[in-house]
Amino acid sequence: VVYKARDRVTNETIALKKIRLEQEDEGVPSTAIREISLLKEMQHRNIVRLQDVVHSEKRLYLVFEYLDLDLKKHMDSSPEFVKDPRQVKMFLYQMLCGIAYCHSHRVLHRDLKPQNLLIDRRTNCVKLADFGLARAFGIPVRTFTHEV
């Protein structure tokens, strides 16, 4: 669950992604560990910025920059958007820049969809978000068969 919040120190609007730690024996979910470890290494204008990680009793909060619009909401509320090839190309270019940056850092997002592409309304900047299913890739440890 993601909440809109205000940083008490900077007065900046932020997004808080709450992760429940209900099972004491299981610890932090692997999706949260992956998202944190990958995002703290990546800094790019087309990737959502992870600002902090806060641990409190039975909860983990990921603190992100706040962006209130995703591509799905944008397309639903602005049907003329898909008819404007210049704007579509601009958004697609930014998305590809973010993906290229991920790949250059050996990260596969694995959950690209309009809801995971956030838009900064002030700058029209598109940012990849939700790296919970993302994976780092490298040389495979074991060889896989070519047969299914």
Swiss-Prot record:
GO molecular function, one term: protein serine kinase activity
Residues at the catalytic site: D111
Protein residues bound to ATP: V1, V2, K17
SMART domains, sorted: S_TKc
InterPro entries to which the protein is assigned, alphabetical: CDK, Kinase-like_dom_sf, Prot_kinase_dom, Ser/Thr_kinase_AS
One BP annotation, GO: regulation of G2/M transition of mitotic cell cycle
GO CC annotations, alphabetized: cyclin-dependent protein kinase holoenzyme complex; cytoplasm; nucleus
Enzyme class: transferase
Keywords: ATP-binding, Cell cycle, Cell division, Kinase, Mitosis, Nucleotide-binding, Phosphoprotein, Serine/threonine-protein kinase, Transferase
PROSITE patterns named in the record: PROTEIN_KINASE_DOM, PROTEIN_KINASE_ST
Modes of activity regulation: Phosphorylation inactivates the enzyme; while. Thr-145 phosphorylation is required for the catalytic activity of the enzyme.
EC numbers for this chain: 2.7.11.22, 2.7.11.23
Pfam families registered for this protein in UniProt: Pkinase
Reactions that this protein is recorded to catalyse: L-seryl-[protein] + ATP = O-phospho-L-seryl-[protein] + ADP + H(+); L-threonyl-[protein] + ATP = O-phospho-L-threonyl-[protein] + ADP + H(+); [DNA-directed RNA polymerase] + ATP = phospho-[DNA-directed RNA polymerase] + ADP + H(+)
Annotated family: Belongs to the protein kinase superfamily. CMGC Ser/Thr protein kinase family. CDC2/CDKX subfamily.
Reported function: Plays a key role in the control of the eukaryotic cell cycle. It is required in higher cells for entry into S-phase and mitosis. Component of the kinase complex that phosphorylates the repetitive C-terminus of RNA polymerase II.
Protein name: Cell division control protein 2 homolog 1
Lineage: Eukaryota, Viridiplantae, Streptophyta, Embryophyta, Tracheophyta
Designated gene of the protein: CDC2
